[in-house]
UniProtKB/Swiss-Prot annotation:
<dbReference type="Pfam" id="PF00361">
    <property type="entry name" value="Proton_antipo_M"/>
</dbReference>
<dbReference type="InterPro" id="IPR010096">
    <property type="entry name" value="NADH-Q_OxRdtase_suN/2"/>
</dbReference>
<feature type="transmembrane region" description="Helical">
    <location>
        <begin position="323"/>
        <end position="342"/>
    </location>
</feature>
<keyword id="KW-0813">Transport</keyword>
<feature type="transmembrane region" description="Helical">
    <location>
        <begin position="99"/>
        <end position="119"/>
    </location>
</feature>
<feature type="transmembrane region" description="Helical">
    <location>
        <begin position="124"/>
        <end position="144"/>
    </location>
</feature>
<keyword id="KW-1133">Transmembrane helix</keyword>
<dbReference type="InterPro" id="IPR045693">
    <property type="entry name" value="Ndh2_N"/>
</dbReference>
<keyword id="KW-0874">Quinone</keyword>
<dbReference type="GO" id="GO:0008137">
    <property type="term" value="F:NADH dehydrogenase (ubiquinone) activity"/>
</dbReference>
<feature type="transmembrane region" description="Helical">
    <location>
        <begin position="149"/>
        <end position="169"/>
    </location>
</feature>
<dbReference type="GO" id="GO:0048038">
    <property type="term" value="F:quinone binding"/>
</dbReference>
<feature type="transmembrane region" description="Helical">
    <location>
        <begin position="227"/>
        <end position="247"/>
    </location>
</feature>
<keyword id="KW-0150">Chloroplast</keyword>
<dbReference type="GO" id="GO:0009535">
    <property type="term" value="C:chloroplast thylakoid membrane"/>
</dbReference>
<keyword id="KW-0520">NAD</keyword>
<keyword id="KW-0793">Thylakoid</keyword>
């Protein structure tokens, strides 16, 4: 009798444990509904691809786009909810993480229309391209909400693997293969360095992997000012530096930008920086809270090197994509200012605001490059000479996006930089802000050089590419032009829109 009672109690306890273990992921899964929509979209794409023919190609774009739009909608409906830590501490939802997830989804939503005509012209496989884009987006979203060292390592690897495959998507292109090999080798090395830094952090905290628990562990073990934390800081900074691509971790960027398909470059140029910025902000602000006197000077050096080298080397480039690669290195230097300033002086809000404008400016520029490349087959800056005489709309759109990237008033880029530099100045980063102002002037110089070429009417400067330029019918490139128009409008928003955007960004801070 006693044996039967004990046996029944054991069965009941086992059942409760099983139900609790089953209920936990099911309950937590309801809080990652935006990510779940993307996963469902991925499965649907695979199912349709395995049962359809080439006539169903428009459905692939529709499913991908609607999945991203629905994910954005679900994310907005979740706005203002209480912060939650899910999946036994692996994932955290709060407004700060969600605004970065929104930016990543926005990037992907704008990038897919840029790819439609390009993929058809280059005869690339469509389904795989969309699968890689959605999977990379999913990895970036999980990285934004990652709350422990394992997830912070696995999520960017998901993003990176898709990035490697996308950069080498044109397999017959030698430059694309070279770019992929460099990207893969540098990415593998940086991941090894990053996980080595995590091992120092894990050991110093007494075996903790959650970000907040690492802080508590460092306090308990009295290791928060130890040499081990300094070593971890250096290795983690180098590992994250590859994702952000500041100088001197920028060597892969120009080659990958030049060799990869242009829509892929547009996608990588914004999503990788948004996801890495979200991760870097949380890592530096939480586990290395007690080491701010060490990582502030370290990031200042990276920001100065990025702003100077990126903008100076961009002057000498002859390829539009290589020029934008070095320009992006300079741009990440400005973003680092916001990370250094932190929450105290509105640094995070200014960083988020500037990244929102940077997405529109950069994607608008790449949309123009994709259109010009499809119609002429060239990427050389000199071949843009006289474009205004053949296609004023495209030339003006490119000019507006470049001027906004340079930070000329009254365009959006000017007000984004102004707020970012003002927050840096209030935080006492006078030298860093001065370097930022100087390099912004330098960037305006090489952007104006390109705009001068666009507007020139002298026949001796116009190359055969523009002389034989034929504008495609409206129905042919309407998806690219739609993305371009949206980005150009967002890049030219006057400063009157800054206050509500900054207010929303400030409300998201943790």
């Amino acid at each position: 009798m006693i044996w039967h009672v004990q046996n029944e109690n054991l069965i009941l306890d086992s059942t409760r444990i099983f139900m609790k273990a089953f209920h936990l992921p099911l309950f937590d899964g309801s809080f990652i509904f935006p990510e779940g929509i993307l996963i469902f979209g991925l499965i649907l794409l695979l199912m349709i691809d395995s049962t359809s023919d080439q006539t169903d190609i428009p459905w692939f774009y529709f499913i991908s786009s609607i999945s991203l739009v629905m994910s954005i909608t679900a994310l907005l409906f979740r706005w203002r909810e209480e912060p939650r830590i899910l999946f036994s501490g692996n994932f955290q939802t709060n407004n700060f993480n969600e605004i970065f997830q929104f930016l990543i989804l926005l990037c992907s939503t704008l990038c897919i229309p840029l790819s439609v005509e390009y993929i058809e012209c280059t005869e690339m496989a469509i389904t795989e391209f969309l699968l890689f884009v959605l999977t990379a987006t999913l990895g970036g979203m999980f990285l934004c909400g990652a709350n422990d060292l394992i997830t912070i390592f696995v999520a960017p690897e998901c993003f990176s693997l898709c990035s490697y495959l996308l950069s080498g998507y044109t397999k017959k292109d030698v430059r694309s293969n070279e770019a992929t090999m460099k990207y893969l080798l540098m990415g593998g090395a940086s991941s090894s360095i990053l996980v080595h830094g995590f091992s120092w952090l894990y050991g110093s905290s007494g075996g903790e992997i959650e970000l907040q628990e690492i802080v508590n562990g460092l306090i308990n073990t009295q290791m928060y000012n130890s040499p081990g934390i300094s070593i971890a800081l250096i290795f983690i900074t180098v590992g994250i530096g590859f994702k952000l691509s500041p100088a001197p971790s920028h060597q892969w960027t120009p080659d990958v930008y030049e060799g990869s398909p242009t829509p892929v470059v547009a996608f990588l140029s914004v999503t990788s920086k948004v996801a890495a910025s979200a991760s870097a902000t949380r890592i530096f602000d939480i586990p290395f809270y007690f080491s701010s006197n060490e990582w502030h000077p370290l990031l200042e050096i990276l920001a100065i090197l990025s702003m100077i080298l990126g903008n100076l080397i961009a002057i000498t480039q002859t390829s539009m994509k290589r020029m934008l690669a070095y320009s992006s290195i300079g741009q990440i230097g400005y973003v680092i200012i916001g990370i250094i300033v932190g929450d105290a002086n509105g640094g995070y809000a200014s960083m988020i605001t500037y990244m929102l404008f940077y997405i529109s400016m950069n994607l608008g520029t790449f949309a123009c490059i994709v259109l010009f490349g499809l119609r002429t087959g060239t990427d050389n800056i000199r071949d843009y000479a006289g474009l205004y005489t053949k296609d004023p709309f495209l030339a003006l759109s490119l000019a507006l996006c470049l001027l906004s990237l340079g930070g000329l008033p009254p365009l959006a880029g000017f007000f984004g930089k102004l707020h970012l530099f003002w927050c840096g100045w209030q935080a006492g980063l006078y030298f860093l802000v001065s370097i930022g102002l100087f390099t912004s002037v330098v960037s305006i110089y090489y952007y104006l050089k390109i705009i001068k070429l666009l507007m020139t009417g002298r026949k001796q400067e116009i190359t055969p590419h523009v002389r034989n330029y034929r504008r495609s019918p409206l129905r042919s490139n309407n998806s690219i032009e739609l993305s371009m128009i949206v980005c150009v409008i967002a890049s030219t928003i006057p400063g009157i829109s800054m206050n509500p955007i900054i207010a929303i960004a400030q409300d998201t801070l943790f």
